[in-house]
């Protein structure tokens, strides 16, 4: 029966089965790959409803925008080495994620990238300003200046 299903349908079966086992630890590798937009929404709702204080879900993914509302801590690996491992609340206390004017570059900027809206930046959060964590920018900042990021969090 499974061999007649599309890749996305198979993915839904496997994710549903994994969640239905009610295991305390569930590992998922790229669970949203192959899912269409409505299915990604279903996935987020299913995972959100299945999580509680007694369950841990570890997701390996390149599709971070599909999952950012579900994530409470982030681990970034380089090969077999963990180069970053922090709770989201600690990340936004120490780093500021913002869109700045193209002329706004100072030494607190760790990483920036051009966009139509301006410069997307990751900065040291020296003022305690609140910002929304951008996981893709964080990933790029970690690999652009690993040493500086590690010093900020250690």
Task: Enumerate the predicted regions with their spans.
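ABC ATPase nucleotide-binding domain "signature motif"
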Residues: 5-12
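Catalytic Walker B motif of ABC-type/P-loop ATPase nucleotide-binding domains
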Residues: 26-30
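ABC ATPase nucleotide-binding domain "signature" loop
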Residues: 33-35
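Helix N-cap at the start of a conserved alpha-helix in ABC-type nucleotide-binding domains
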Residues: 37-39
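ABC transporter nucleotide-binding domain
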Residues: 43-122
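C-terminal coupling/interaction segments
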Residues: 109-154
